Amino acid sequence: MAGLKLQAVTKSWDGKTQVIKPLTLDVADGEFIVMVGPSGCGKSTLLRMVAGLERVTEGDIWINDQRVTEMEPKDRGIAMVFQNYALYPHMSVEENMAWGLKIRGMGKQQIAERVKEAARILELDGLLKRRPRELSGGQRQRVAMGRAIVRDPAVFLFDEPLSNLDAKLRVQMRLELQQLHRRLKTTSLYVTHDQVEAMTLAQRVMVMNGGVAEQIGTPVEVYEKPASLFVASFIGSPAMNLLTGRVNNEGTHFELDGGIVLPLNGGYRQYAGRKMTLGIRPEHIALSSQAEGGVPLVMDTLEILGADNLAHGRWGEQKLVVRLAHQERPTAGSTLWLHLAENQLHLFDGETGQRV
């Protein structure tokens, strides 16, 4: 068991432009951290730096209180699970799981014990003699994880391990990964572009954008209190509604570009007259009535999702999505009267994009 620390780590390919800006992260012993962000945000590069597969330009990496910044990958005490299973097709499941230990010179008895235990944990006991071609995608991924488990690493590194699986298998493997971490309690750093994976697996999430950690927090924190416009727009499906406008002179209302005026929950007078963005999640908008002071929205389209429905409309040029109950199915062109929960409104600075 070990902790992981990244201290002001940067990466530059040309010595000028930083693709990873100075980034500091403390991962507690046994903690499961997920790095999530769009393609090209730097999350896989950062993971490879921790693994020793990419050189750190500046800063330091520590594993178990030992500085490993220049250390060879094999000496860092890490095990990595990739997007591609990378199994040897001519070897059995048992041989694939044992191979890394064999080339390290571990004794046969110890190898057999470790493989047996990993197979038991991953429910691969009855598949040890099979070849990869005889396995399903989920079983192959479990073999790849078993190959990492037998090494008994200080830190697990996962690089989008579920992205090659179909939707149903991904759900199953997410649950298996949760159970695996609860059992092993090994420090883990996991990379994905899938926010559902991030929210369901992580104890803490690091949302990355353009080589910067926009926010580090629990899944609940990043969902309920996004630190920036990027986090607000990236986390959540559908994304948070983001509406541009200004706070009125009294700080009591938000005036949207397009004439709609929304009440604020007070305390915003210091932002009077400033260009701001107001955010609210679709589930925090309720159906109301004109008599109750509801705000009108002409619905353009309705998405029927089964458990609930999504109504789409516009206030001027600004799009709005409202999550409705399963039984609510208004027709296109009808007017919805809406109430926005004032205690669920988020304000972001119009220039910096940061939460205020």
UniProtKB/Swiss-Prot annotation:
<keyword id="KW-0067">ATP-binding</keyword>
<dbReference type="InterPro" id="IPR003439">
    <property type="entry name" value="ABC_transporter-like_ATP-bd"/>
</dbReference>
<dbReference type="GO" id="GO:0055052">
    <property type="term" value="C:ATP-binding cassette (ABC) transporter complex, substrate-binding subunit-containing"/>
</dbReference>
<protein>
    <recommendedName>
        <fullName>sn-glycerol-3-phosphate import ATP-binding protein UgpC</fullName>
        <ecNumber>7.6.2.10</ecNumber>
    </recommendedName>
</protein>
<keyword id="KW-0997">Cell inner membrane</keyword>
<dbReference type="GO" id="GO:0016887">
    <property type="term" value="F:ATP hydrolysis activity"/>
</dbReference>
<dbReference type="InterPro" id="IPR047641">
    <property type="entry name" value="ABC_transpr_MalK/UgpC-like"/>
</dbReference>
<feature type="binding site">
    <location>
        <begin position="37"/>
        <end position="44"/>
    </location>
    <ligand>
        <name>ATP</name>
    </ligand>
</feature>
<keyword id="KW-0762">Sugar transport</keyword>
<dbReference type="GO" id="GO:0015430">
    <property type="term" value="F:ABC-type glycerol-3-phosphate transporter activity"/>
</dbReference>
<dbReference type="InterPro" id="IPR003593">
    <property type="entry name" value="AAA+_ATPase"/>
</dbReference>
<comment type="subunit">
    <text>The complex is composed of two ATP-binding proteins (UgpC), two transmembrane proteins (UgpA and UgpE) and a solute-binding protein (UgpB).</text>
</comment>
<keyword id="KW-1003">Cell membrane</keyword>
<keyword id="KW-0813">Transport</keyword>
<dbReference type="InterPro" id="IPR015855">
    <property type="entry name" value="ABC_transpr_MalK-like"/>
</dbReference>
<dbReference type="InterPro" id="IPR008995">
    <property type="entry name" value="Mo/tungstate-bd_C_term_dom"/>
</dbReference>
<dbReference type="Pfam" id="PF17912">
    <property type="entry name" value="OB_MalK"/>
</dbReference>
<dbReference type="InterPro" id="IPR040582">
    <property type="entry name" value="OB_MalK-like"/>
</dbReference>
<keyword id="KW-1278">Translocase</keyword>
<dbReference type="GO" id="GO:0001407">
    <property type="term" value="P:glycerophosphodiester transmembrane transport"/>
</dbReference>
<dbReference type="InterPro" id="IPR012340">
    <property type="entry name" value="NA-bd_OB-fold"/>
</dbReference>
<dbReference type="Pfam" id="PF00005">
    <property type="entry name" value="ABC_tran"/>
</dbReference>
<dbReference type="InterPro" id="IPR027417">
    <property type="entry name" value="P-loop_NTPase"/>
</dbReference>
<keyword id="KW-0472">Membrane</keyword>
<dbReference type="InterPro" id="IPR017871">
    <property type="entry name" value="ABC_transporter-like_CS"/>
</dbReference>
<feature type="domain" description="ABC transporter">
    <location>
        <begin position="4"/>
        <end position="235"/>
    </location>
</feature>
<comment type="similarity">
    <text>Belongs to the ABC transporter superfamily. sn-glycerol-3-phosphate importer (TC 3.A.1.1.3) family.</text>
</comment>
<dbReference type="GO" id="GO:0008643">
    <property type="term" value="P:carbohydrate transport"/>
</dbReference>
<comment type="function">
    <text>Part of the ABC transporter complex UgpBAEC involved in sn-glycerol-3-phosphate (G3P) import. Responsible for energy coupling to the transport system.</text>
</comment>
<keyword id="KW-0547">Nucleotide-binding</keyword>
<dbReference type="GO" id="GO:0005524">
    <property type="term" value="F:ATP binding"/>
</dbReference>
